[in-house]
């Protein structure tokens, strides 16, 4: 399964790991994925893998309850 946010599609970023001598080697910054359960429009629960930032945004907008 790909490490990708199922709501907004945010995926891993690629950057450099810098040693003390400033030699650059490639590294990957993974997304902080969490599992949440949201009820559909018909009431059935659905499990999604979303990033922690998406959960924070959903709580701030009032879409997700504060307990999740």
UniProtKB/Swiss-Prot annotation:
The keyword Cell inner membrane does not apply. GO terms for molecular function: structural constituent of ribosome. It comes from the Bacteria. Keywords: Ribonucleoprotein, Ribosomal protein. The keyword Ribosomal protein applies. GO terms for cellular component: ribonucleoprotein complex; ribosome. One of its GO terms (biological process) is translation. Transmembrane segments: none annotated. PANTHER family: 50S RIBOSOMAL PROTEIN L28 (PTHR39080), LARGE RIBOSOMAL SUBUNIT PROTEIN BL28A (PTHR39080:SF1). HAMAP family: Ribosomal_bL28 (MF_00373). Belongs to the bacterial ribosomal protein bL28 family. This is Large ribosomal subunit protein bL28. It comes from Mycoplasmopsis agalactiae (strain NCTC 10123 / CIP 59.7 / PG2) (Mycoplasma agalactiae). The gene is rpmB.
């Amino acid at each position: 399964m790909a490490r990708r946010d199922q709501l907004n599609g945010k995926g891993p970023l690629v950057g450099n790991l810098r040693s003390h001598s400033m030699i650059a080697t490639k590294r990957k910054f993974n997304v902080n994925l969490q599992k949440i359960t949201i009820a559909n429009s018909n009431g059935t629960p659905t499990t999604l893998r979303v990033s922690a930032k998406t959960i924070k945004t959903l709580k701030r907008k009032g879409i997700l309850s504060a307990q999740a």
